[in-house]
Amino acid sequence: MFRFETLNIWHDAVAFAVKIFDYTETLSNEYKFSIGSQLNRSGLSPSNNIAEGSGSESAKDFRNFLNIAVRSVYETISGLTVAYKKQLITEELYRKLYQDGETLSKRIRKFRQTLSP
């Protein structure tokens, strides 16, 4: 088993990515390959950065990857906000994904604080 598989934040980030992919699959072709593709990349980035960072030799390096993971959540929320403003996502789903992103970013930051400097 890889170290990242033992981390709840990684499992949460994977669940977030799956929700983003589920949403982007509903987009029309007009948006699927533009904003949809960007959302998929940014939505997948948190789990990938947590996984990659967990293999770091130092806590400092791992913390850097966790910082990137948080910023990727922010990027995803920004993209979802554009989709919402363009009426490409329902308010209900937007609010749910927004809340999921907010919770995930807080959990990653909290975990980051547990790593020694």
Go through each PLM region and give its residues.
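Amphipathic alpha-helical assembly/interaction segments
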Residues: 1-117
